[in-house]
């Protein structure tokens, strides 16, 4: 079923040829129908690309930053949240997309307390391990 999600999207824009754009309510992403019709995204990456959004926030009055995701809950999979400082935020955004792809491809094998590869010089690395923790989202919308 998961593999057919993006195929369903492509079928919809073909069934409605006058469609101008598609808005993904769960993630807040908007794509033109033309972008969906003409994409070259590999099948296994389409759901993450089209239906999942990774957001970045500066925490006001601090040096802290936040990266989180929206959209995985569409398939009853967990979204991610990173609370950090003194790290390049684009590295964290890329890390989030990599972890989201892993969760999607493997039907969420990560449990609270499990270690995952961290980031060294912008790349995922086993030199630094991060511990996963399931908790409620700090930024709206409410999700677990």
Positions of predicted regions on the chain:
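Structural alpha-beta junctions
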Residues: 8-23, 101-111
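Short, well-structured alpha-helical interface segments that form or flank functional binding sites
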Residues: 4
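Aromatic/basic-lined ligand-recognition segments
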Residues: 27-144
